[in-house]
Amino acid sequence: MFSRAGVAGLSAWTLQPQWIQVRNMATLKDITRRLKSIKNIQKITKSMKMVAAAKYARAERELKPARIYGLGSLALYEKADIKVPEDKKKHLLIGVSSDRGLCGAIHSSIAKQMKSEVATLTAAGKEVMLVGIGDKIRGILYRTHSDQFLVAFKEVGRKPPTFGDASVIALELLNSGYEFDEGSVIFNRFRSVISYKTEEKPIFSLNTIASAESMSIYDDIDADVLQNYQEYNLANIIYYSLKESSTSEQSARMTAMDNASKNASEMIDKLTLTFNRTRQAVITKELIEIISGAAALD
């Protein structure tokens, strides 16, 4: 009496609500899984923000006395008006970063500044060598400037930098065998908890300082004294840049983790709303099926 096509169509129509229900249940499971994952990530970002806030408070306290040493050492170069002769070609670029990430554009801003300086100095006929303080800056620049790397330092940023760390870096540079004429230290100077600025400070070799016209008025300065002062000055400037970079990094990480936590909250709210709507749709479909079945029996 009934055709085969009619029976097939009836079967498809009868099974359709069940497939819809299974699909909605699978969607609910996916949403639940995503919610759980995002909530776990939010816990991690909140914890990292708290850790970064504690480290930032300590770094900011230690930055104030470190600035005195750094600015004092830089004042000599400014007041002495040390200038490098045109025939001097060797330039050293020191980039200060760290081994840790999740702190915004802290490391990429240093790399961008160093790439720009390398291009400018190379175009001017200078011989440029690079020094990377921190594994992040080495990882960014080594792919494109591996032939210009003099030395790279790791294990930076895991603990607060000390003057001993800066002294080790300065000694390694002095013993590297590369006799540079002048150089620059590129780092992020801390301005506020939400702001930092990439800056560049000069450094000079012993020969450049000794041959400066303004230094010739001090005839009684012993060569050993001037050498000790130059080495101490180099360590001071590196220490100052490490402290500035460390404070900037912790404040940037704290801000980044705060933004990540807020974004996670927004995603949780949206997924919760989607979950509730999907669950309501499943319940509505089940009620329709029950009512339709009851009406058919009547």
Swiss-Prot record:
Keyword Zinc-finger: no
Superkingdom of the organism of origin: Eukaryota
CDD domains named in the record: F1-ATPase_gamma
Keyword Kinase appears in the UniProt entry: no
Residue positions where N6-acetyllysine is found in the record: 39, 55, 115, 154, 197
Pfam families membership: ATP-synt (PF00231)
Its biological purpose: Subunit gamma, of the mitochondrial membrane ATP synthase complex (F(1)F(0) ATP synthase or Complex V) that produces ATP from ADP in the presence of a proton gradient across the membrane which is generated by electron transport complexes of the respiratory chain. ATP synthase complex consist of a soluble F(1) head domain - the catalytic core - and a membrane F(1) domain - the membrane proton channel. These two domains are linked by a central stalk rotating inside the F(1) region and a stationary peripheral stalk.
Name the record gives this protein: ATP synthase F(1) complex subunit gamma, mitochondrial
